[in-house]
């Protein structure tokens, strides 16, 4: 049996690449920083049985047309809105992702962003570096709110939402959460948690942190109408997906003082242009989509992405299948290439 041919759109951490090379013929786009051009992607995918891609790669019908042998798309990400899932399913192409392995990293980073924006840590650093610390200590200098006793609103209570709630509970806060269903199992473990509707969460929370996937339903979930419901003393945190927040409405909210500030790791446009309006606010902390950027998490993501891809080519159920409907279109035994 011929070895499967795999295209990897970026150099990924070990042990992911080594795992693939043990059982597949692998072509790698030799860059850590830049994705392949559209032309390069279409050219390299032609004879491949499998694709390992990143969220920077748009995988649509055109790509699938260029790859008639394609059996599995393994994305090195939790989100998969960069892949046309219905199209892949229709063609019998398995799509997998990497949930769970970056949960702790993103939850830790979320707490870090909350502290950074509320306690004005980035603003303080900038003041020292630009020579503006030119006055004696005074009791009002760079003050911000404590977390203790505050109400934290979590929009979405999946793996990352739960992990964030666990960490925040140690600050002696009240946690409101909104999700498509009530999580009794979590409420029994984490103290001071309350299930509520989205509008109530926005109206009562001192900090609103977003933890939902990007879908048609969550696109611009946080829009002008909902931003206006937040307290003027509240902060918005987003480590989920950029388009969940209407950027134009958020800029307006910050300019007009509807909210106290924001901390963002994701954006509707990535990379964010250096002259973007969001870069002009001292009460906004910005990060370049690095919430999962721990050494350990990125290694686990690579390993899971490789395991997903290899499992499908072995005719086995992958650890994290996105489109379960594909099993009815093309059973796993029909895509088996690795003994």
UniProtKB/Swiss-Prot annotation:
This is Glyoxylate reductase. It is an enzyme of class 1 (oxidoreductase). GO terms for cellular component: cytosol. It is found in: Cytoplasm. It comes from Thermofilum pendens (strain DSM 2475 / Hrk 5). The gene is gyaR. The keyword NAD applies. The keyword Glycoprotein does not apply. InterPro entries: D-isomer_2-hydroxyacid_DH, D-isomer_2_OHA_DH_cat_dom, D-isomer_DH_CS, D-isomer_DH_NAD-bd, Glyoxylate_reductase_GyaR, NAD(P)-bd_dom_sf.
